[in-house]
A protein has these predicted regions:
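Extracellular beta-strand-rich recognition modules
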Residues: 76-80, 149-155
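Extracellular carbohydrate recognition
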Residues: 143-145, 156-173
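Extracellular/lumenal carbohydrate-interaction signature centered on repeated Trp-anchored short motifs
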Residues: 54-77, 85-88, 109-112, 141-147
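Extracellular glycan-recognition surfaces and repeat-rich motifs
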Residues: 13-50
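Beta-strand acidic-aromatic groove motif in beta-rich domains, primarily in extracellular
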Residues: 83-98
């Protein structure tokens, strides 16, 4: 879902590569597996959980992080799927970090075993949290987006071995 008047800043559709995305947080940092077909549409990236470490995330490459300042009041959207539909781990779905602090967001439902689209507005009132705690204000969102150092999208939703997949990442500027 996108909101009116939003200009696309970048889109990663994983048609020919992993486009610089990494996996972080399991037991280290890895390149995700690239799949040329089966995505939403065409290619996608995935990771099979080692079931040894903490919740793992897809970590955005520099071009995505550099585009975040222009995305204030815009949207971040993507599609996810997981290997099982079971009650899982409660954790942040999106994390954006910068010297000013940490923003996090949790969707109401996890992805299913088929491609599930997600979208969130990069603005106050959308459900963003500031430094693990309070609702984020627009000034706090602006301060983190002004100089971000990382963007991570959750890939793990189960305890134990599982697989998560990511596709169709789009960052749009606010109107």
């Amino acid at each position: 879902m996108s909101w009116p008047q939003e200009r696309t800043l970048l889109a990663h559709d994983f048609q020919s590569s992993s486009q610089g995305w990494l996996v972080s947080g399991d037991t280290g940092q890895f390149e995700p597996q690239f799949h040329a077909a089966g995505g939403h549409p065409e290619g996608y990236i995935s990771h099979v959980d080692e079931a040894l470490g903490e919740t793992w995330y897809f970590r955005a490459p520099e071009d995505v992080v550099r585009a975040l300042p222009a995305a204030e009041n815009g949207t971040l959207s993507y599609s996810l799927k997981q290997s099982a539909d079971q009650p899982g781990v409660l954790d942040d779905d999106i994390i954006i970090v910068g010297p000013a602090g940490r923003l996090s967001f949790r969707f109401a439902t996890p992805p299913g075993t088929r491609w599930t689209p997600f979208a969130v507005k990069l603005a106050a009132g959308a459900g963003w949290r500031w430094n693990w705690n309070a609702p984020a204000t627009q000034a706090q969102i602006r301060s983190v987006l002004a100089n971000p150092t990382s963007l991570e999208i959750r890939g793990e939703y189960q305890t134990g071995p599982d697989e998560g997949a990511l596709d169709s990442v789009v960052l749009r500027a606010g109107g």
